[in-house]
Amino acid sequence: MVKRAMCHIRLTALFLAILACVSIPYTAGARAQAAGSIEQNFANSLTAVPADALAVSGAFYVPVYSSVSMSQGKLRADFSVTLSVHNASETRPLVLKRIAYFDTAGKLVESYLKAPIALKPFSTVEVFIATSDVRGGTGANFVVDWAATGEIAEPAVEALMVGSVGSGHSAFISQGRPIKVIGK
């Protein structure tokens, strides 16, 4: 009975090793979404940046978890991150001035906008960070600076983390917190 169990364990380990080797080529090159790709990937969500003065502005802080420590820090689970910025206004464009990704130490990892962009009413843009991109660490965050030409519904900014731990899958959301609002 013990021999049979050992054989089963070895076969399972071999299968997992083969599976890992087969999946590595598909994930090794995965990194965070490139700066400037928001304009390309979400062209249908965008409109021209308003020529009028931006009278209202604000910023959101969004904690994200590209990695989570487990077992008293001995193990690490990695997660993909999707940051979503939703224009909650039905009538007015939302200008995004900055989408910046910071690591656990507060160091800028990547800036996702080359220039301000404007979201159409009720539209959304996203930034995706692959599971294999752990540059942010366990205390990563985004800062999203926004503006509008006048009174506007506050944008909805949140991050979805998805990953696997053992044979289970986990998904959770982190909501952005307003850290600055100027004008009304």
Regions found by a protein language model. Give the residues of each.
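Bacterial N-terminal signal peptides that target proteins for export
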Residues: 2-15
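Bacterial N-terminal signal peptides
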Residues: 12-25
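Terminal connector regions
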Residues: 34-46, 133-184
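Short, solvent-exposed beta-strand/turn "edge" segments of beta-rich domains on protein surfaces
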Residues: 68-76, 89
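Short, solvent-exposed loop/turn segments enriched in Ser/Thr/Gly
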Residues: 75-82, 140
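Asparagine-centered strand-capping/turn motif at beta-strand->loop junctions
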Residues: 85-92
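Short, hydrophobic/aromatic beta-strand segments
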Residues: 92-99, 110-112, 154-156
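Intrinsically disordered, low-complexity Pro/Gly/Ser/Thr-rich segments with frequent PxxP/GP/PP motifs
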Residues: 103-141
